[in-house]
Design a protein with these regions (language model features):
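A conserved structural/catalytic subdomain of Rossmann-like adenosyl-cofactor enzymes
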Residues: 1-197
């Protein structure tokens, strides 16, 4: 479990390009965003049954270029097990929304070829100028992760094929629909009320 610095600039790309320790097998992260460099370093440190969970900025879920290629390669190797979206303003020094990604080197058969998305960004309480997860928010996240099944407006299990069709974009709202159904408006009724005035 880790919380590396968000979008670290000048993280040491020039050293990583040599890749003498085979830490960056999925590609070298861009010089201006070190997020996936940290993720790959952690991944390379795992044994064959290892699991990692790390806090990342949302940008790594959808940015293109080198990050998109790294994300694609990691998805094709079936490493992503879950992507959990958290509220903005949760961490000191970072007002942007964050996610936790869970990568597993040896997924169980029932999870192979699938990624669980959890949209937990609305579960919090204001605490001064920060947002804070309550016990029930944490319990909901754990329950959704452990059950690894769809939960309306909260969690969705998505096949890798669907992620491929979305250009390997892992933006949570692309998969978990949290929109509220809009009330239908009867135009005839509204026009009738207007004409009565």
């Amino acid at each position: 479990l880790s919380n590396p610095p968000f979008s670290l600039k000048n993280w040491g790309r020039e050293v990583a390009e040599a890749n003498s320790y085979n830490r960056f097998n999925y590609g070298v992260a861009p010089a201006s965003y070190g997020d996936l460099a940290f993720v790959q370093h952690m991944l390379a440190s795992l044994n064959s049954k290892g699991v990692l969970a790390t806090v990342v900025p949302h940008g790594i879920l959808f940015r293109g270029g080198e990050e998109g290629k790294i994300r694609q390669a990691m998805l094709e190797d079936d490493l992503f097990e879950a992507v959990i979206g958290f509220p903005q303003n949760l961490f000191y020094g970072a007002g942007i929304p964050a996610s936790v990604i869970i990568l597993r080197k040896n997924k169980s058969e029932d999870k192979k070829g699938k990624v669980l998305f959890i949209e937990a960004s609305q579960g919090f309480v204001k605490d001064g100028n920060k947002n804070k997860l309550r016990e029930e928010d944490i319990a909901n996240i754990i329950s959704a992760y452990e059950s690894f099944e769809d939960k309306e407006k909260y969690a969705k299990v998505v096949d890798i094929e669907d992620i491929r069709k979305n250009d390997y974009n892992l933006n949570i709202t692309r998969y978990v629909d949290t929109s509220e159904e809009e009330e239908e408006i009867d135009i005839e009724e509204v026009l009738g009320r207007i004409s009565e005035r």
